[in-house]
Amino acid sequence: MAKKSLIYREKKRQKLEEKYHLIRRSSKKEISQIPSLSEKWKIHGKLQSPPRNSAPTRLHRRCFSTGRPRANYRDFGLSGHILREMVHACLLPGATRSSW
């Protein structure tokens, strides 16, 4: 189980990313449309003004059961070992059992 503080930190990053998503997207669109370099630098400065944690690259997928940040399956939202346990317990319909 991951520490609660790490899980809350990740949730805070998700909220920040949602808040600043439109600002980032609009300024990136402006940069691609403007031909002059000096104006691009000004818009680039605006792009750097939101907090670092609002960048989408700082987000990690976490297992919703344990909070583990590694070995996550996107389709299920689970880490590998929890996914295996749930498949063996027949809790995931349509998943076939396998041992590795």
Swiss-Prot record:
Q: Name one GO molecular function term.
A: structural constituent of ribosome
For this UniProt record, the keywords arranged alphabetically read as follows: Chloroplast, Plastid, Ribonucleoprotein, Ribosomal protein, RNA-binding, rRNA-binding
* Localization of this protein: Plastid, Chloroplast
- Please give an example of a GO cellular component term from this record: small ribosomal subunit
Q: Name one Pfam family in it.
A: Ribosomal_S14
| Keyword match Isomerase | no
Q: Does the keyword Ribosomal protein apply?
A: yes
PROSITE patterns annotated for this entry?
RIBOSOMAL_S14
Q: What is this protein for, i.e. what is its function?
A: Binds 16S rRNA, required for the assembly of 30S particles.
Query: Per its UniProt record, what NCBIfam families does this chain match?
Result: PRK08881.1
Q: How does it assemble?
A: Part of the 30S ribosomal subunit.
Name the protein family.
Belongs to the universal ribosomal protein uS14 family.
HAMAP family per the UniProt record, alphabetical: Ribosomal_uS14_1
Q: What is this protein called?
A: Small ribosomal subunit protein uS14c
Q: Which organism is it from?
A: Aethionema grandiflorum
